[in-house]
Amino acid sequence: MNPVSLIFLAFAMSTDAFAAAIGKGSSLDRPRLSEALRTGIIFGVIEAITPLVGWLLGQAASQFVADWDHWIAFVLLVLLGLHMIHNGLRADHETEQEKPGQHSFWILAVTALATSIDALAVGVGLAFVDVNIFLAAGAIGLATMTMVTLGTMLGRALGAVTGKRAEMVGGVVLILVGATILYEHLSAA
C-alpha cells in the first residue's frame, strides 16, 4: 500500500470516532483540553489495536485465499464504506444521553470499541495486501487520537452540522482506498 493510501485509510478509519467525539464534546458544557486528550488517547489506542487483531485473523486465513486476497480487501472496504455512507444518510439514532461531564473511562472505551469494529474488518483486509501492519495501525491510532481530540473540543459548535457528513466522507474514502488496492494488484498482474 502506498503512503498516500495509508494516510487516507488512517483518516477514513477515524471519521466515525470523530463523529462520536463531536457528540461527546457537545454534551460537555465547556470541553477542556485534558478531557479531549484523554478521550483521544483512549479512542486512538483502541483504534490502533483493532486492525492488528483483524490482521492476525486475516493472516491465519491468508494461505487459503491467496489467489483472491485483493478482492477480499476490496469488497470489505467497499462494504464498510457503503455502510458508513448509509449511516451518515440515516436519521439520527435515538441514543441514551449522558449527563455533562459523565465520560468515564468505561463509557469512552465502549464507545471507542463500537466505532473501531470497522478497523477490525480493515485489519482483516490488510492481511491480504502488502502493508506494514504496525505502521498502518500506528497511523490509524494517531489519526484517530488527533481527530477525536479535535472532535471533542469542537463538539459544542460542530455537533449539529458535521457529525453525519464526516461519516459519509469516511465511507467514500474507504471505497476509494479499496478501489486503489484492487487497481494496484490488477495492474501489477
Curated annotation (Swiss-Prot):
Q: Which organism is it from?
A: Pseudomonas aeruginosa (strain LESB58)
The chain's coiled-coil residues are none
Q: Which residues cross the membrane?
A: 3-23, 41-61, 65-85, 106-128, 141-161, 168-188
Q: Which UniProt keywords apply?
A: Cell inner membrane, Cell membrane, Ion transport, Manganese, Membrane, Transmembrane, Transmembrane helix, Transport
What taxonomic lineage is listed for the species of origin? Answer: Bacteria, Pseudomonadati, Pseudomonadota, Gammaproteobacteria, Pseudomonadales
Gene (name only): mntP
What family is this protein classified in?
A: Belongs to the MntP (TC 9.B.29) family.
The protein in question is named Putative manganese efflux pump MntP
Top-rank lineage group of the source organism:
Bacteria
In terms of PANTHER family, this protein maps to: MANGANESE EFFLUX PUMP MNTP-RELATED
